[in-house]
C-alpha cells in the first residue's frame, strides 16, 4: 500500500519514469558509441565524432527553447487552458519552420569551408549534420510540450524508441551497406524522424 501510494504521487511517478528513461537512453548512447567505434575504425569514427561535436555546438541555443516551451506549456496546463497550449505550439512551430527555411541554405553554403576544416572526404556529412540539427529543433519543441503537460511516459517512450532505432539502423547500415560515418548519420536521421512521430 505504501509503494502504491508513492506511485500515485505525480511527482514521485514522474521523477521515477524520467530517471529510468534517462538511464536507458544514456545506456543506449554508450553502446551506440562503443559499437560504432569498433565497426568504423579510428578514421571514420573520428569523422563521426567531429560531426556530432558540431551538432552539439550548433544546437546549444535549443536548450533555451526547451526551457521556454516547458515553462509556458506547464503554465497553460495548470490553468487548464489547452487551447492556449495548442495555439502556442503552433506559433512556435511556425517560427521554427521559418528559421529553418532561412538558416538551412546559409548553413549549406558554409559546408565547403567546414568540410575542409574538419578534413572530411564528403560534404554530405555536413549536410546531414544540418538536417539533424533542424530535426533536433523540431523534436525538442514537442518533447518540451510533453514535459510541460507532465506526460513523462510519452516523453520517455519517444526518447527510448529513437535511441533503439538509432543503434539498430546505424549498425545495420554500416554492416550491410558500408563502413562509413555517413551511414551512421543516415540511421540517426531516420531514428529522429521515428522519435518525432512518437512524440507527436
Residue ranges and their predicted role:
Residues 15-25, 126-132, 146-171:
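Alpha-helical transmembrane segments of multi-pass membrane transporters/permeases
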Residues 22, 28-32, 49-77, 96, ...:
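Small-residue-rich midsections of specific transmembrane alpha-helices
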Residues 97-105, 109, 113, 117-142, ...:
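Alpha-helical transmembrane segments of multi-pass membrane proteins
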Residues 1-28, 83-85, 90:
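N-terminal membrane topogenesis motif
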Residues 126-127, 156-200:
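Hydrophobic alpha-helical transmembrane segments
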Residues 22, 26, 53-56, 91, ...:
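Residue-level recognition of pore/gate-forming positions within transmembrane alpha-helices
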Residues 33-56, 181, 186:
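Interfacial/gating helices of multi-pass transporter permease domains
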Residues 30-44, 115-116, 172, 177:
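Helix-terminus/linker motif at the lipid-water interface of multi-pass membrane proteins
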Amino acid at each position: 500500500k505504501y509503494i502504491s501510494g508513492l506511485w500515485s504521487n505525480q511527482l514521485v511517478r514522474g521523477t521515477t519514469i524520467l530517471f529510468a528513461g534517462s538511464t536507458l537512453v544514456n545506456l543506449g548512447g554508450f553502446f551506440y558509441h562503443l559499437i560504432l567505434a569498433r565497426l568504423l575504425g579510428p578514421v571514420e569514427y573520428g569523422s563521426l565524432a567531429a560531426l556530432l561535436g558540431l551538432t552539439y555546438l550548433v544546437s546549444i541555443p535549443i536548450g533555451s527553447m526547451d526551457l521556454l516551451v516547458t515553462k509556458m506549456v506547464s503554465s497553460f496546463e495548470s490553468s487548464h487552458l489547452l487551447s492556449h497550449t495548442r495555439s502556442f505550439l503552433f506559433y512556435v512551430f511556425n517560427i521554427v519552420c521559418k528559421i529553418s527555411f532561412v538558416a538551412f541554405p546559409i548553413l549549406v553554403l558554409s559546408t565547403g569551408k567546414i568540410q575542409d576544416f574538419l578534413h572530411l572526404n564528403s560534404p554530405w556529412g555536413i549536410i546531414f549534420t544540418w538536417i539533424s540539427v533542424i530535426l533536433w529543433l523540431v523534436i525538442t519543441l514537442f518533447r518540451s510540450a510533453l514535459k510541460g503537460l507532465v506526460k513523462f511516459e510519452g516523453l520517455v517512450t519517444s526518447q527510448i524508441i529513437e535511441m533503439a532505432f538509432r543503434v539498430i539502423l546505424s549498425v545495420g547500415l554500416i554492416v550491410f551497406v558500408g563502413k562509413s560515418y555517413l551511414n551512421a548519420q543516415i540511421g540517426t536521421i531516420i531514428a529522429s524522424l521515428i522519435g518525432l512521430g512518437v512524440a507527436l
